[in-house]
Amino acid sequence: MSLKEEQVSIKQDPEQEERQHDQFNDVQIKQESQDHDGVDSQYTNGTQNDDSERFEAAESDVKVEPGLGMGITSSQSEKGQVLPDQPEIKFIRRQINGYVGFANLPKQWHRRSIKNGFSFNLLCVGPDGIGKTTLMKTLFNNDDIEANLVKDYEEELANDQEEEEGQGEGHENQSQEQRHKVKIKSYESVIEENGVKLNLNVIDTEGFGDFLNNDQKSWDPIIKEIDSRFDQYLDAENKINRHSINDKRIHACLYFIEPTGHYLKPLDLKFMQSVYEKCNLIPVIAKSDILTDEEILSFKKTIMNQLIQSNIELFKPPIYSNDDAENSHLSERLFSSLPYAVIGSNDIVENYSGNQVRGRSYPWGVIEVDNDNHSDFNLLKNLLIKQFMEELKERTSKILYENYRSSKLAKLGIKQDNSVFKEFDPISKQQEEKTLHEAKLAKLEIEMKTVFQQKVSEKEKKLQKSETELFARHKEMKEKLTKQLKALEDKKKQLELSINSASPNVNHSPVPTKKKGFLR
């Protein structure tokens, strides 16, 4: 064999040896997997205490046996010599088939949730006396919903009214004006059930719909309250220290519809058009026990047609890909049953079967709160609490709040560049921070001006009232003094007349008086 042929054979041998090496590795992997099938089955049957040992063994299973790779050294290949095949390198590969531990993440989340508890902010809107408070007490099975008043927007005005008590008709007119305003009150309570704590915040709207002319002023305070809670959360996110953000955003809005049985009023449609993009809207027909089943079905159909024509979107329970048929059917039923015809009562009555149930007793029978044949109370509880409370909070955070945040920042002139390779410009960053800071200052300035103007107007009213009272008092005293002066003059004239009539013949010439001094 010539030297040229030997060099060609040397160049072809590595390719052949690579193919042989791959075949040998495949056979070796199959053998190793068969050898360790029994060990893995023993591990999965309960021997989970050796996780760390097996993990270390798996890491150290990749071994390289001593030998000459490919059987050819560099010096021999340069000389053109061919050596016999040498023992090849053996690779042992293993996969970790043991228990890693991330399946315990739900348990960790459960433990953390039990420790921290949950929070839920619920807005109740409807006319006074429609049963908002009663339904809240029935939903959460707690009669102390209104025990802790956290925030009252009319508190300052009430304090001013107390200072002005007993000061005339001006106070009565002012208090009458205050009674015709929507008052927003926030109540907080901690409810515990089976070791799970819920921080419940119920926001009530007193005076809604009580105006003779229910224009935009009827729902403006409610919209401002929702926006202010979004602004508070946005300001908390922009702070340096964000570990203690208290979420006060409205997670759901229960709108109470009067049980007229006909159609929605213009006020109902206008309010729901203004609020459905800011919170999860859930309409309910209050006091539905005054309607028959046929009237309820007809009323529901009319309401849904009006909402569709007005392009008002209600909260729709999501259906996930891994949901079974029962959960999917429940989600569809919860949405198709809107608006819910509900009743509220925590009174315990006895039904016809002799069982103690929550409900109301009438001369014609007993209506049960938790009976699906009597009301949609259980559907509302499933949607609001039992099944989709976290979905309500998630939609508020990821959709409604993000839409509000984007529009808010866009109004401030802050735009986002979606390019991936974006250079950091400190000047533009500083300009954005300056814009945000100026917006905050402008907001604070507007709030301070509003408060200042309010205080000034209240002080002016007090001064005007005091001035009016002083003028009235001065006038009254002047008239009184004038009457007294006139009475004294009349009395003087009477005395003079009586003196003249008593001594008619007396000489009224002046009597000379004695002079004092030494010249008398």
From Swiss-Prot:
**Mainly localized where?**
membrane
Biased segments, Basic and acidic residues type: 1-24, 51-64, 168-179
What does the record say mutating K4R does?
Abolishes sumoylation
GO:BP terms for this protein? cellular bud neck septin ring organization; cytoskeleton-dependent cytokinesis; mitotic cytokinesis; protein localization; septin ring assembly; septin ring disassembly; septum digestion after cytokinesis
Question: Phosphothreonine is carried by which residues?
Answer: T47, T468
Localization of this protein: Membrane; Bud neck
* Start-end of Acidic residues biased regions: 156-167
Q: Give the span(s) annotated as Disordered.
A: 1-83, 156-181, 496-520
Q: How is it modified after translation?
A: Phosphorylated by CDC28. Phosphorylation at the end of G1 may facilitate initiation of a new cell cycle by promoting disassembly of the obsolete septin ring from the previous cell cycle.
The record's annotation in InterPro entries points to: G_SEPTIN_dom, P-loop_NTPase, Septin
The source's domain of life comes to Eukaryota
Binding-site list for GTP = 126-133, 207, 287-295, 344, 360
Q: Is Transcription regulation given among the entry's keywords?
A: no
Describe what happens upon changing K443R: No effect on sumoylation
Bias (Polar residues) occurs at 497-510
- Subunit structure, per the record? Component of the septin complex which consists of CDC3, CDC10, CDC11, CDC12 and probably SHS1 and rearranges to a cortical collar of highly ordered filaments at the mother-bud-neck. A complex formed by CDC3, CDC10, CDC11 and CDC12 is capable of forming long filaments in vitro and the components seem to be present in a 2:2:2:2 arrangement in vivo. The filaments are proposed to be formed by the end-to-end polymerization of CDC3-CDC12-CDC11 complexes with CDC10 serving as a bridge to bundle the polymers into paired filaments.
Family, per entry: Belongs to the TRAFAC class TrmE-Era-EngA-EngB-Septin-like GTPase superfamily. Septin GTPase family.
The protein in question is named Cell division control protein 3
Q: Which gene encodes it?
A: CDC3
